[in-house]
Amino acid sequence: MRIGIVTREWPPAVYGGAGVHVEHLVAALRSLPAGPELDVHCFGDPRGDATGHPVPEPLREANGALQAWGTDVEIAAALAGADLVHSHTWYANGAGLLASLVHGVPHVITAHSLEPRRPWKAEQLGGGYRLSSWTERTAYLAADAVIAVSGGMRDDVLAVYPELDPARVHVVYNGVDPDAYRPVQSPDVVRGLGVDPDRPYALFVGRITRQKGLPHLLAAAEQLPGDVGLVLCAGAADTPAERQQVADAVAALQARREGVVWIEAMLPREQLVPLITGATVFVCPSVYEPLGIVNLEAAACGTAVVASAVGGIPEVVDDGRTGLLVPYDEADPAGFAAGLAARMSELLADPDRAAAMGAAGRERVLSEFGWAAIAQRTTEVYSAVLAARD
């Protein structure tokens, strides 16, 4: 079985959960006894064992959605000879769709997010958002199977695309490598990042995008006790305007309280893991989140999580056992910020309870979210799709 994996992100150019997912899924698939043969195709220059596909020269100044389609055309041509194509995110869905039409091979999509649920992407793509939405819809309706990364995501897929046969939409959870993400206490690393390891702190890790809800967290921080810290590991802004909004809010917060640190970078794992481990609480204020792999990473590091109760997050954060959930209502941002502040304050004031939740979170990761099981389940979807074509 020869599988063509298509992804926009591939190490070292990984900036979001979808890229992390593809990296670990490919490694786990390759580790399976008698597993499939994989050809990885990524956007950009060739790297590692992936075939890179830079944006075609005539499209270098074009809208980002047109650049993606130009790259997808080249990838689709390179997929001749695959038995099945598996694409990740709308950026790559076009390549899978074209390969399916031109080469007659089945196409499997992993749903990491849905364009209609992310209208703010129009700020990044402009008119290209209409093309990204059309690409996703067309690819999903034509796909042989759709893999949702959570039960909540499956419900979302069927709600947004009701024409899809529910039997074609499968749940295969996202995962985390518990060896790569494990409790690592290193006050020196934390201090080297400008964070006081002796001050209890809440930690946010994520991209600067409307989806991640960072402005809500900054509003909540105004209500936190004065003796605790807030660390924001946030970069890769969708737009300059979003970055500036965060910069202004952080500067205002830093002027009013101590212990607010903004690390404007996506840290390497050897720095990120000690930073997560050292936090009393990890906070995920997302307003939209199909699963939230970052919450699994925090749990694997033994850190309690406070998160919004949206999308697939409640399937990852066991409320009251591995963390605390906060209801999100788009019409009540002040209430959401107050809820975040209250739950964060609970755990920051009770480090023993937070530590117990963190230990329970790691235990759950070890039992339910390993990559070997995810890879096995993915190959079962491949086999079922290929059998249906015979």
Annotate each predicted stretch with a short phrase:
Residues 287:
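Aromatic "clamp/platform" in nucleotide-sugar-dependent glycosyltransferases that forms part
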Residues 1-47, 372, 389-390:
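N-terminal subdomain of nucleotide-sugar transferases
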Residues 243-266, 270:
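Nucleotide-activated donor-binding/catalytic signature segment of Leloir-type glycosyltransferases, i.e.
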Residues 274-279:
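Short alpha-helical donor nucleotide-sugar binding micro-motif in glycosyltransferases
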Residues 152, 175:
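Carbohydrate-associated surface elements
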Residues 281, 304-307, 317:
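Short hydrophobic beta-strand element within catalytic cores of glycosyltransferases
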Residues 44-46, 176, 229-247, 261:
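Glycosyltransferase donor-sugar binding loop
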